[in-house]
C-alpha cells in the first residue's frame, strides 16, 4: 500500500485506541485485510473508528493488531516516504518495509471484537458529502466538540 494511504489510516485511527491493561486488544489499530480493501479499526469502548480504503488490498484475507507505540512511530516516519509500504506479518511480529526504513514490531495477541456488529446495517439515515465541502466544514465542527467537552458544566459562550 502507498505510504500516504497508510499514514491516513493511522492518523484517522490512532486517537481512538485505548490504554486498557485488562483488554490489551483494544490498545492498538486493527488491520482487517481482504482481497478487496483494507480496513483500519480502533476503539476504546466509547468511540469506534472504522476507516476503509479500497486503494489498497491484500492477496488474501488476514488481520493483525498493531500496538499504539509502533503505530505512532510509523505516523512519524510515513510523512518522509512517498513509495509503497510492504507489510509482512505472522502471529507474533510484523515487518514494515519502506524505501528508507524497515521496522519490526511485536503484534498484540488476541481476537479483536466484531466491530461490524455495533454499526447499524439498516440505518435509513444516510449522508453523502462532497470531500471538498467536508474539508471546509470539519475543523469548525471538531472545535465545537472539543469546546463542549472542556466546558461540560457550563455551556460555551
Segments the model singles out, each with a brief description of its role:
Residues 111:
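Glycine-rich, pocket-lining loop/helix-strand segments that form or immediately flank
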Amino acid at each position: 500500500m502507498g505510504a500516504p494511504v497508510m499514514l491516513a489510516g493511522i492518523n484517522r485511527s490512532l486517537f481512538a485506541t485505548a490504554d486498557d491493561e485488562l483488554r490489551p486488544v483494544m490498545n492498538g489499530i486493527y488491520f482487517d485485510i481482504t482481497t478487496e480493501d483494507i480496513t483500519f479499526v480502533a476503539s476504546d469502548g466509547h468511540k469506534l473508528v472504522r476507516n476503509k480504503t479500497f486503494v489498497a488490498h491484500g492477496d488474501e484475507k488476514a488481520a493483525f493488531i498493531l500496538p499504539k507505540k509502533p503505530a505512532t512511530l510509523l505516523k512519524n516516519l510515513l510523512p518522509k516516504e512517498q513509495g509503497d509500504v510492504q507489510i509482512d506479518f505472522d502471529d507474533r511480529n510484523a515487518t514494515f518495509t519502506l524505501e528508507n526504513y524497515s521496522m519490526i514490531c511485536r503484534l498484540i495477541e488476541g481476537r479483536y471484537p466484531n466491530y461490524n456488529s455495533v454499526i447499524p446495517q439498516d440505518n435509513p439515515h444516510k449522508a453523502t458529502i462532497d470531500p471538498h465541502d467536508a474539508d471546509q466544514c470539519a475543523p469548525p465542527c471538531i472545535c465545537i466538540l472539543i469546546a463542549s467537552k472542556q466546558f461540560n458544566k457550563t455551556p460555551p459562550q
